[in-house]
């Protein structure tokens, strides 16, 4: 897969996230995508449930900003390391807004089919996020 195709998928998705635009998923993910996140018991199956999860995070952290720190492309797989920063200004599950700033690093491996994410494996430290919010010890 040409690197330009990968860069375009990544650009669309992260620019959308940084604008708070969940609909960017429509251009970056297949409608029947599967997204696995370490620590989440079941994968998100389909773009609808994935967008709902992302919307919850963007509501909790409306100033959420992602940067891609590193990227590797091999065949139909794209791996990248990212950093997210934001301030919890909305509820996160049962936890009310704390007003606290967070910074979290993560890793993603995407399997690309027809220039869209068909399957994603994502790992980031949810415990660190909760600690930064004062919600875990």
Predicted regions located by residue number:
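C-terminal and inter-domain tail/linker signature
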Residues: 1-137
């Amino acid at each position: 897969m040409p690197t330009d195709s990968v860069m375009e998928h990544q650009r669309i998705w992260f620019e959308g996230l940084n604008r708070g635009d969940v609909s960017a998923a429509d251009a970056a993910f297949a409608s029947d995508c599967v997204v696995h996140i370490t620590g989440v018991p079941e994968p998100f199956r389909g773009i609808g449930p994935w967008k709902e999860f992302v919307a919850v995070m963007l509501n909790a952290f409306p100033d959420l900003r992602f940067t891609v720190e590193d990227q590797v492309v091999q065949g139909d797989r794209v791996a990248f390391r990212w950093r997210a920063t934001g301030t919890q200004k909305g509820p996160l599950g049962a936890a009310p807004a704390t007003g606290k700033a967070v910074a979290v690093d993560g890793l993603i491996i995407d399997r690309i089919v027809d220039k869209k994410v068909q399957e994603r494996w994502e790992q980031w430290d949810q415990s660190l996020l909760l600690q930064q919010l004062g919600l875990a010890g």
